[in-house]
A protein has these predicted regions:
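A structural-propensity feature for long, helix-poor, extended segments
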Residues: 155-179, 305, 313, 321, ...
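Short beta-strand elements
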Residues: 149-158, 168-172, 273, 286, ...
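Short Gly/Thr/Asp-enriched flexible loops that form oxyanion-binding sites at enzyme active sites
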Residues: 129-141, 282-289
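Gly/Ser/Thr-rich active-site loops/lids in small-molecule metabolic enzymes
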Residues: 139-154, 189-192, 220-241, 289-302
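Short, glycine-rich nucleotide/cofactor-binding loops
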Residues: 16-27, 171-184, 214, 309-314
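Conserved small/polar residues in nucleotide/adenosyl-binding loops
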Residues: 326-332
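Active-site-adjacent loop and "lid" segments of alpha/beta metabolic enzymes
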Residues: 246-296
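Contiguous, glycine/small-aliphatic-enriched amphipathic segments in soluble metabolic enzymes
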Residues: 1-126, 134, 186-205, 216-268, ...
Length: 336
């Protein structure tokens, strides 16, 4: 059984109720049909019955719950709660109603906030900012969270690196140019996400164009400082930097460029220095190595809400639903 098949088996065993708010996108219905066929989750699709019927033509989504915000008896409760949560920001009943009726991501997040759903997956036709803004406004962050960030779970076929091709890449979707403290926080969160997803111990590489002082630049200094901060805060975590990509994952190169490192040559968590590098990096691996890329999945929000790439396929949505809502309940035994 492959890694993602194991994840799907976990999803079936502990089904969550997931909101899919993007009823205007055909991929939502293609994914929903597959999720329901595989019995991976209970689904809520937000939209009018007419819109859902038209959008899902030729697909079986009959087991999904269709919630029409205009007709749902709980809509007023969501309006009232949104006013309560955002009153200090000037939210009025009229504005709250307009917001949740015109933006189904807001509506879906309110369903999660009120306990009517376990989580939400969105972003196939909305930007990351538009997807995560309501989450940060309404759900807030987990206690103790230093920074909300995003990661991709990468599953690379026929790959000898990482844990048989399984990696976490962070941050590839949210923080543009993190400072050393933020980069350290991304590393900490990504390591914990890897541990929860796979049951394996993370080996974290702080990536750079330099390995152990081979280049001098302010960008390198940032990664060096982030590595120091993360190590001091997490002395038991296998984490090292700064490392070039080949030194991080190729054993022979790691032994040559960083012979004293416990991470070099065997990293399974790759932390990119900025969003440009991370976004380009995951897409290169996805497109050229034919990797499965699940995400960007958020770290640090108080409830499981996850973004999608606007270039995602229906199968990508299926994978994100399966992965996102099993990692919180995975046992500690290894899955890879």
């Amino acid at each position: 059984m492959g890694f993602i098949d194991t994840i799907k088996a976990r999803a079936k065993a502990d089904k969550k109720t997931i909101v899919l708010p993007e009823s205007e996108d055909r991929r939502t219905y293609e994914a929903a049909a597959q999720i329901l066929k595989e019995d991976l989750a209970n689904l809520i699709i937000i939209g009018s019955e007419e819109a859902v019927k038209k959008g899902s033509e030729g697909l079986d989504v009959s087991k999904a719950t269709i919630v029409d915000p205009e007709k749902n008896e709980k809509t007023q409760a969501y309006v009232d709660k949104l006013v309560e949560l955002r009153a200090k920001k000037g939210m009025t009943p009229e504005k709250a109603r307009e917001t949740i009726l015109n933006d189904y991501t807001y509506y879906g997040v309110m369903m999660v906030k009120m306990g009517d759903a376990d989580g939400l997956v969105s972003g196939a036709c909305h930007s990351t900012a538009n997807t995560l803004r309501p989450c940060l406004q309404i759900l807030k962050t987990k206690p103790g969270t230093k920074l909300v960030s995003a990661f991709f779970l990468m599953v690379v076929p026929d790959c000898e690196y990482g844990d048989d091709g399984v990696f976490v890449f962070g941050d590839c979707g949210l923080n543009q140019n993190p400072n050393p403290e933020e980069l350290a926080a991304i590393a900490e969160s990504s390591a914990e996400s890897y541990r929860m997803l796979t049951g394996n111990e993370p080996r974290v590489a702080m990536l750079s164009h330099s390995s152990k002082g081979s280049a001098k630049h302010a960008d390198v200094d940032k990664v060096v400082e982030a590595t120091r901060i993360a190590k001091e805060a997490n002395p038991d975590l296998a984490l090292d930097g700064e490392l070039q990509l080949d030194a991080a994952i190729v054993p022979s190169v790691g032994a040559s460029k960083a012979p004293d490192s416990k991470v070099a040559g065997k990293a399974n968590v790759l932390i990119f220095p900025d969003l440009d590098a991370g976004n380009i990096g995951y897409k290169l691996v996805q497109r050229l190595a034919k990797a499965e890329a699940y995400g960007p999945m958020t770290q640090g929000i108080a409830a499981p809400v996850n973004d999608l790439s606007r270039g995602c396929s229906a199968e990508d949505i299926v994978g994100v639903v399966a992965v996102s809502y099993t990692h919180l309940t995975l046992p500690t035994n290894s899955l890879v």
